[in-house]
UniProtKB/Swiss-Prot annotation:
One Pfam family named in its UniProt record: 2Fe-2S_thioredx
Cross-referenced Gene3D superfamilies: Glutaredoxin (3.40.30.10), NADH-quinone oxidoreductase subunit E (1.10.10.1590)
Name recorded for this polypeptide: NADH-quinone oxidoreductase subunit E
Chain coiled-coil ranges: none
Gene: nuoE
Amino acid sequence: MNTKTTNFTFAFDKKNLNLAETIIKKYPPNGKRSAILPLLDLAQRQNGGWLHISAIEYVANMLEMPYMRAYEVATFYSMFNLSPVGKYHIQVCTTTPCWLRGSDDIMKICEKKLAIKHKETTKDQKFTLSEIECLGACVNAPVVQINDDYYEDLNEAKMEKLIEQYLNDL
């Protein structure tokens, strides 16, 4: 889906609007822009795991900041997805420690088992496969993040088993 041409208007639902207002109150009145990360995350979670352009604009307006500043934040951090992702977003860390411990093999297993490549989503919208920069768990490399869960000390067999579990919806 092209996020620039889709007619879609984002707004927090009542529950998330209350949560957003609570988050904003944690910051001083002149520093509410600092709530940008948690509010973008909240918007992404409400929107099925990705940020539509209108969600970024909505958050920017809520924080009384220029849209471009919010967009810069959303595009800088790899935790934000600017296009739809599958139900299970598999992110393989490929930075040096993980690469040295076999992240290339982990990526190949994912591609083979799911029949997709990096930055693709399965036809049933169940899986999206991505590379991600350091997840901060280098001591337990290689590491994969699936949605909010980390899986560490992986090898090909462990990754195959993990994918099977997700194929069966755990």
